[in-house]
């Protein structure tokens, strides 16, 4: 479980970024959303110790992040940054994914097993000898996820994972997140994309001006007037509301509910 207890964060200039943050995330897929500058990335960087609270505590499975280094917390909370290109430096995909497990001091047999498993999880089997730099945007994003998965953290943070992806890349990302969820990975997703939230999230945490404005099930989140938070309501939700239908995530579910 990830727990924030009265967490505050501010910079040296006195600007408050997070104010009295309290919530518990027990597992599944959590989307963290909100306007630009609301504190989303600051919040998730506290989960693996990249930032420490100025006040309050972040507890991950009973471990206070104040008491551990970033390296120690990264074994528990994996972090995939917004721009995956910055992560890549090896000559091929296999070596890229193997780097993390090797740093853990694992045997080559275990390293290879983890690499094959991680690539399979993200749909990149057969890419082992490819250069990371020649992959498409969607493939690079999935490779970045595989690199973290191979370390086998319990929690996986994806910071704006769909930035720069075309429709095909986005569909591939959605499929990967769904598969990870089915395989019992716990995912924390930072995004502005409400379509992505609708497709994959179990719970949503909404930030504005450094404060939590909503935390709860995704179906309750989409009952809010998202215009108040500079967020765009998905067309599927608009249609469902106009027709007074139950909560639906996508076109396929909408068709089933309507009975077409």
From Swiss-Prot:
Residues 2-234 form the ABC transporter domain. Coiled coil: none annotated. Its main location: membrane. SUPFAM superfamilies: P-loop containing nucleoside triphosphate hydrolases (SSF52540). Pfam families: ABC_tran. It is found in: Cell membrane. GO terms for cellular component: ATP-binding cassette (ABC) transporter complex. Gene3D superfamilies: P-loop containing nucleotide triphosphate hydrolases. GO terms for molecular function: ATP binding; ATP hydrolysis activity; ATPase-coupled transmembrane transporter activity. It is a peripheral membrane protein. Its EC number is 7.-.-.-. ATP binds at residues 34-41. It is an enzyme of class 7 (translocase). Keywords: ATP-binding, Cell membrane, Membrane, Nucleotide-binding, Translocase, Transport. GO terms for biological process: cobalt ion transport. Belongs to the ABC transporter superfamily. Probably part of an ABC transporter complex. Responsible for energy coupling to the transport system. This is Putative ABC transporter ATP-binding protein PYRAB01300.
